[in-house]
Amino acid sequence: MQFVKTKLTVLIGTCDKYQPLWENFTTCFNKYWRLDTRNIVVGETKPVLGFETILPGTGLCWGERMLEGIENCSDYIFFILDDYFLSDFWEEDLFKKYIEDIEKHNINCLQISPSDYQTYSTERNCPYLQISDFSQYIISMQPSIWRKSYLQQVLLSHYSPWDFELAGTHVLNVNGDPFLQKKWRVYRDGEAPKRYFNAVRKGFVKCPGWEEFKEKENLKDF
């Protein structure tokens, strides 16, 4: 579908230390990603087979490397990390609807996975939950579709992924609209199921459920 292909880029963040995840990530991505899109991995020095790879080198912060990747993306970005192993099918028709709704409702970021700790504001005639300007995790690395210009605005070059969620959220909270609480126009699809398995936690610690997921998907241990 040319509509989605021209508007959406997949951006995957990684680093050399996470190379043991790449084969499993690729296996799951190729199995479950049903869209014809440009798929970019931003790493450090090592290419990821099967993906367009941008390698700024070592010595740069995660945020600086991601911003270089974002420069190469289209207007809308499906932004994930390499420890998110897809676990269910992602279809083109769904993303077409998401992009159409993002444009119709002037959405800056649409989170399309379940999440905890967020609070919401109401908005008439919009099918999604609007995350309050003062919510925890108004910035989240849960799978989301980002407007490119907004992602460039809120992702600072010195951030790590955890800084992006925590410090980035704090910046938006401090600068939010105290009355309407809707300045940032960040939303979540409240009906979206979880379609991925988070393989590791901070510190490269395997997440609970890894053994079961590995067996189900016939993956390799790492």
Which residues make up each language-model segment?
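Short, solvent-exposed loop/turn segments at secondary-structure junctions
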Residues: 15-18, 45-48, 59-60, 83-86, ...
